Design a protein with these regions (language model features):
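Short glycine-aspartate micro-motif
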Residues: 75, 85-89, 146-150, 214-218, ...
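Glycine-rich phosphate-binding loop and adjoining helix at the ATP-binding site
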Residues: 109, 113-213, 349-360
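Hydrophobic "anchor" residues
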Residues: 106, 163-164, 233-234
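Short secondary-structure boundary segments
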Residues: 153, 219-221, 270, 340-341
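Active-site glycine-centered loops adjacent to acidic/histidine catalytic or metal-binding residues
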Residues: 194, 220, 386
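ATP-binding/phosphotransfer module of carbohydrate and carboxylate kinases, centering on a glycine-rich
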Residues: 1-64, 68-73, 77-113, 117-144, ...
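Short, acidic, Ser/Thr-enriched surface-loop or helix-capping motifs
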Residues: 101, 159, 228
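Glycine-rich phosphate-binding loop of actin/hexokinase-like ATP-binding domains
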Residues: 211-268
Length: 423
């Protein structure tokens, strides 16, 4: 039987440093006293930790709090220039790459629009690599200052030694995306599902902030969720929890891109909405066929004058409400956040109807305790969520890394990085 691991003074110091840094990052600017109170650390411990974090360039003094006559206390926040992170949103026809400083302020953006209906893995790697190079050049930061790259993808992400993507709807079956990107960029890469990335961004900064039990919905071409349970992202046995778009809403119904019939995505996904409109109004003038977002916007805008648009959106509201009711009944969240470009577009005009439809299908008690709200971070929130992946890694390690910001790459080993032991 293996012996239990002994907690050392070094482990405790790293844990305390991480706790303090998390609080400053998410809730700063804070005083030292506030850091100690929320992190559960003594004044002496906080004083020593903050001195180290300031000396290491991770945290900065940013002025004094307003005083009511007592001695004003210094305010702390993370140092934006400590390092930089990159977030990537891999869509099915677009790749968005954004570079952020350590406080997650946007510094550069690059968008690639592909000319194929579904992005091949090799093409995706090429677009991501091109985008990374472009944003580093635009922001004029040294590559050595990049703490990491977080990549959000459609499909299931299996976290083995390296992340492997299973995107059944887009033909990505067992794609070793993390290894491919490490080889092409030489940077530390983290990969996660797009809905989970969106959920993390909304929980840190957006409409799910302050919740311990929430469901963040991503509606676009694909449909998925991020489930927050007791303050943690619920992943399941193989990190595939949350594939709400492939729950059955109509037995034997429309064929979904995954190959099954009756999936929710086949009724409320963007492609399904456009196809249903075309079925009811062949050759209708609801936007350009090549511009799916434009087509959806046109359908929403014409709902009062176009009977086909009104019928399509009425069906979407009903199915979406029923699907949200399932989430309410299954997970008992305090909040459901509707996000993704399609979710934002629909809820801007139709959220009251969606709430009403959800209430018609949900159990009374859990529905009486839930808020259904629109996401707050906009259409690029998935890339921001990708950027939170390397940030979370740094914060959880207490920013115990070598050099200025990032760990240093091991010579001759692309993508491998050294880490400095805790002080």
């Amino acid at each position: 039987m293996p012996r239990p691991r002994t907690t050392t003074v070094r482990d405790l110091r790293k844990s305390n440093r991480s706790s303090a840094l998390w609080q400053v990052f998410l809730n700063g600017p804070l005083t030292r006293q506030e850091v100690g109170a929320v992190a559960g650390l003594s004044p002496a411990t906080v004083s020593n930790l903050v001195a180290d974090l300031v000396a290491d360039g991770v945290v900065a003094e940013v002025g004094l709090e307003d005083s009511n006559g007592g001695r004003p206390r210094g305010l702390l926040q993370v140092n934006p220039g400590y390092g930089y992170v990159i977030g990537v949103d891999v869509g099915e026809t677009t790749v968005l790459v954004e570079l952020f400083d350590f406080s997650l302020q946007l510094r550069a953006r690059h968008t690639s629009v592909t000319d194929v209906s579904v992005l091949d893995p090799q093409d995706a790697v090429a677009h991501i690599t091109e985008g990374i190079q472009a944003v580093i050049a635009e922001a004029d930061v040294p590559e050595q200052a990049i703490l990491g790259v977080g990549v959000a993808v459609p499909g299931l992400v299996e976290h083995r030694e390296y992340a492997v993507v299973h995107g059944q709807s887009i033909g990505w079956l067992g794609v070793p995306l993390e290894e491919m990107l490490r080889a092409s960029t030489g940077l530390p890469i983290m990969v996660d599902n797009g809905a989970k990335s969106l959920g993390q961004a909304e929980r840190w900064f957006g409409a799910a902030r302050g919740t311990d039990n929430a469901v963040i919905v991503l509606l676009g071409v694909g449909v998925g969720t991020c489930i927050i349970s007791n303050g943690e992202v619920y992943r399941g046995a193989t990190s595939s929890a949350g594939e709400w778009g492939h729950t059955t809403i109509m037995a034997g119904g429309r064929t979904c891109r995954c190959g099954a019939r009756g999936c929710l995505e086949a009724y409320v996904g963007a492609g399904a909405i456009a196809a249903r409109y075309e079925e009811l109004s062949p050759g209708g003038a609801a936007g350009s066929p090549a511009d799916l977002e434009g087509r959806i916007a046109a359908i929403i805008a014409s709902r009062d004058s176009d009977p086909a648009a009104a019928q399509v959106l009425g069906e979407v509201v009903t199915y979406l409400g029923a699907g949200i009711a399932d989430l309410v009944n299954l997970f008992n969240p305090e909040r459901v956040v509707v996000g993704g470009w399609l979710g934002i577009a629909l809820s801007a005009e139709l959220l009251p109807g969606i709430r009403e439809a959800a209430g018609a299908h949900a159990l009374q008690l859990p529905f009486s305790c839930v808020e259904i709200v629109t996401a707050e971070l906009g259409q690029n929130a998935v890339a921001l969520g990708g950027a939170t992946l390397p940030i979370a890694t740094v914060l959880s390690a207490g920013a115990v890394l070598t050099g200025h910001g990032p760990a240093r790459r091991v010579p001759g080993q692309p993508g491998r990085w050294t880490a400095q032991a805790a002080r």
